[in-house]
């Protein structure tokens, strides 16, 4: 029965449902987690990488993090072909907008709903992630504290047993001392150091 009403995003079922939108929301729920947290001195985005391989060029392989322009970045979850269209649209829109309201964090979904958040999570196990964020988030948290919280949330909600640098993407948006907005994506080596620093993984044993 539903097949008659799921061919377009604008066709409602007799119950008032948009099946294509529901399918897209389901795809997001099964995707790797993406978490955004607002700090008093910046924004931190962290995501779970589903595609991991020793053959990947890790320095250039980005699955979750995208730069929109010099002062806007995003983390995505769901079907990447859809995300790429939205990212390209956002890049065009960002070129036409220059009002400054400080650091902000927004989350949107396929239904067109969006809103400002202090901390948000999408993807697999997002309800558990939101629960931890509600409990541990502080309004005056620094960027360093927010990075620690983001890593903690992802490590506790991932489906896999352990969080490693190969399964993680982390980006920060902040002001430099010269008051320029900087978008920084952590390298695998930097991620490994962060995971060790915050007790998520053990330091690698030195070979003699």
Curated annotation (Swiss-Prot):
What are the entry keywords? Cytoplasm, Nucleus, Proteasome
Q: Which residues form a coiled coil?
A: none
**What SUPFAM superfamilies does this protein's entry cite?**
N-terminal nucleophile aminohydrolases (Ntn hydrolases) (SSF56235)
Q: Extract the InterPro entries matched here.
A: Ntn_hydrolases_N (IPR029055), Proteasome_alpha (IPR050115), Proteasome_alpha-type (IPR023332), Proteasome_asu_N (IPR000426), Proteasome_sua/b (IPR001353)
Q: Where in the cell is it found?
A: Cytoplasm; Nucleus
**Which terms does the UniProt entry file under GO BP?**
ubiquitin-dependent protein catabolic process
- Annotated GO CC locations: cytosol; nucleus; proteasome core complex, alpha-subunit complex
Q: Where is the chain membrane-spanning?
A: none
**Family per record:** Belongs to the peptidase T1A family.
Subunit field text: Component of the 20S core complex of the 26S proteasome. The 26S proteasome is composed of a core protease (CP), known as the 20S proteasome, capped at one or both ends by the 19S regulatory particle (RP/PA700). The 20S proteasome core is composed of 28 subunits that are arranged in four stacked rings, resulting in a barrel-shaped structure. The two end rings are each formed by seven alpha subunits, and the two central rings are each formed by seven beta subunits. The catalytic chamber with the active sites is on the inside of the barrel.
PANTHER family xref list:
PROTEASOME SUBUNIT ALPHA/BETA
Role according to the record: The proteasome is a multicatalytic proteinase complex which is characterized by its ability to cleave peptides with Arg, Phe, Tyr, Leu, and Glu adjacent to the leaving group at neutral or slightly basic pH. The proteasome has an ATP-dependent proteolytic activity.
Protein name as annotated = Putative proteasome subunit alpha type-4-B
The species this protein was found in: Arabidopsis thaliana
Lineage of the species this protein comes from: Eukaryota, Viridiplantae, Streptophyta, Embryophyta, Tracheophyta
